[in-house]
């Protein structure tokens, strides 16, 4: 219709007005049909196209066979989202037995699958000794070429390639997700149970059967009901199982951060019959499966975790509609859930198994199965190897949204593998993983059939049914023990909930903000402490000093021209939301910065002792030289910078110089390029940072638009002794200046003062 509007003639009324009056009563033309057609051919064509379009539309919607329309809509969606739904002929897939590997004739039902990147660990040697279980070690590009362990089957990259699995085309060479090859190999060689483990876990008492329900049917199966979380609250969709086993202040990797503060024990449980706990998640003593936020904030840098859980707490099941994080370190899979072993390849490394776990739990409900969590089954030793927050980005960004999506998702497929493929495709559409995992899922499912796995049957889903009322007789009470967290050195108390909640809130707010610190003091005695203090909150802590220290990752910079060093840091962390600069004589009370707008500039323009105007005394003094440099730079500024600066300084007489001590300021991402442009304008000029920074800020934006958060900081211009600093400090202020830190003892005194605002800091001293 838009095309028709553009080419349509003007209305007849306007044409009549334009005709001379003498033509109004001219003799009419003879109505010849052929001439009429030639005169109106364009109208006929347009009307004809319109009629055909409308007819086609109604035909597609009203015909009994709507396949054409559905196909059209599907293709439109695919073209918009660049996704292709795999089409698989399941009946054409033939079972292929292993005929080439040295283990072609070997078959056993119970397997332990691990990924190895180093020579065999003592824990892995212990796994080999577990009776009745076969260890399968999966190598990658980081694995030593001469890797060998008696009693274990080792699949190198070359050995994996010879298996001809479809998934090999999609796997990275240097990742633990190559365990997916091992799962298929185990299934091909008779697996009925697969224990998904790592090479740092030691099975307690060396007996998996003592801890897990290895047998679900038959004489050896435990015929007993299992405690189950109550389904009474439909809005409760995820739980922290560590609370049930005695540790309220510990949370598992993959638990949404907004749920960390929920530490109350269950009012009551229900029960479920055993036999369908096809995925069994074990708890790990020592180093449990915790995320980088917990690992980086709940202990000192070199102190290994040694957390213990209650071994006497009963196992607990999850009802449909409620989920729990599941990992690849300590989990038993029964054959009915082998399809759920697939490790995604398009997400960050520390998110792969957790996303797999949530994906698998949702699909498990389609089979009438459920996940159960078991008391401590292994002891994992902490090697004090922190992993970066970025490795978990797909967890902290997406996991809460993923859980909500999975609970709402429904499928109309009639075969289970089609249901799996449908969910994987929709998850790619929603951005939880990419098309790589759609293709990987298709290859995985075909490989499962090829190695002899039988597709499970779908069962009715209970999510859409009215929940059964929980009667008084159905309620089962269990009060978990409250074990002390030994690593904290204190007994846990009720306030831990709000303390952890605050920490998570601060981390969520500043987790993508880079802190840049210039150390005037000796970095050998303070750099690690500053990173420990602020690294809990910010994305990273970049430390600069007048002297470089490669061992401590301290970069060299001159304070007088510190602003010239910042653009390189901006480029290195280009995805950051913003950058806070602070000198080590200024304390940043981050808990009082939450209300500040991270899209605005922050500086101390409202602090009169920090932001000052100086009138140079003569042409030769230092202030006059700096003022001349400012004039020269302003004259070369692009119009938007120059207008801002002159508007901000219009009340001065043109000879005064604006200065700022610049111990603390913030540059948001949207002003990073402006800051860099201004640095380039300065070039090699010897402009002092106390002059350059206020000039930059006044050029980038109007002071009226600065966020006033730093305006209430405690600021004294004279140097402070430690005793005067103690009386100067206020936990209510956004920042405090000055504060002298020259050694570990000074740092401890500072932390004790800051603990008024962040009580968890007392763990560091």
Curated annotation (Swiss-Prot):
Where is this gene product found?
A: Golgi apparatus membrane
- The main place the protein resides is Golgi
Q: How does it sit in the membrane?
A: Single-pass type II membrane protein
Cellular component terms, GO, for this chain's entry? Answer: Golgi apparatus; Golgi membrane
Q: Which residues are modified by glycosylation?
A: 235, 723
Lumenal-side positions: 65-765
Q: What is the reported tissue distribution?
A: Expressed in cells that are expanding or producing secondary cell walls.
Q: What residue ranges lie in the Cytoplasmic compartment? A: 1-43
An example of a GO molecular function for this protein is:
glycosyltransferase activity
**Transmembrane domains' residue ranges:** 44-64
Q: Hey, which family's this protein in?
A: Belongs to the STELLO family.
Role played: Probable glycosyltransferase regulating the assembly and trafficking of cellulose synthase complexes.
Protein name (record): Probable glycosyltransferase STELLO2
Q: Which organism is it from?
A: Arabidopsis thaliana
Q: What is the lineage of its organism?
A: Eukaryota, Viridiplantae, Streptophyta, Embryophyta, Tracheophyta
